[in-house]
Amino acid sequence: MIQAESRLRVADNTGARELLCIRVLGGSRKRYAGVGDIIVATVKEAIPDGMVKKGEVVKAVVVRTKKETRRPDGSYIKFDENAAVLIDKANNPRGTRIFGPVARELREKNFMKIISLAPEVL
């Protein structure tokens, strides 16, 4: 459950380390983002010589949340941290590697490139 001002770790190799959510995309009244939702964020922490710089405004897709997500079969999935992957205008990941597990819900939202790069899909 990500909202404005939430901080997320970055799960790719773009050079960003931490993001601050500015806006949840998907309608004027959409308040929270879950797994597979797109957010607009700013880079709060970045490594030197990375693809993105500190202060840059980026789009990202949420891949892990601490708040549990209910699945159609009645089970729940939750992670130890909130994490996102930076994406471009065509919803493809900007990085070439994904770190850590990602949720299966990304497959239903058609983020196939992220699914294929991820080391584990839960």
From Swiss-Prot:
Keywords for the protein's UniProt record, in alphabetical order: Ribonucleoprotein, Ribosomal protein, RNA-binding, rRNA-binding
UniProt keyword Ribosomal protein present: yes
GO molecular function, one term: structural constituent of ribosome
Entry GO terms, CC: cytosolic large ribosomal subunit
UniProt-listed InterPro entries: Ribosomal_uL14 (IPR000218), Ribosomal_uL14_bac-type (IPR005745), Ribosomal_uL14_CS (IPR019972), Ribosomal_uL14_sf (IPR036853)
One Pfam family of this chain: Ribosomal_L14
Subunit comment: Part of the 50S ribosomal subunit. Forms a cluster with proteins L3 and L19. In the 70S ribosome, L14 and L19 interact and together make contacts with the 16S rRNA in bridges B5 and B8.
HAMAP family per the UniProt record, alphabetical: Ribosomal_uL14
Family statement: Belongs to the universal ribosomal protein uL14 family.
Function: Binds to 23S rRNA. Forms part of two intersubunit bridges in the 70S ribosome.
Protein name per Swiss-Prot or TrEMBL: Large ribosomal subunit protein uL14
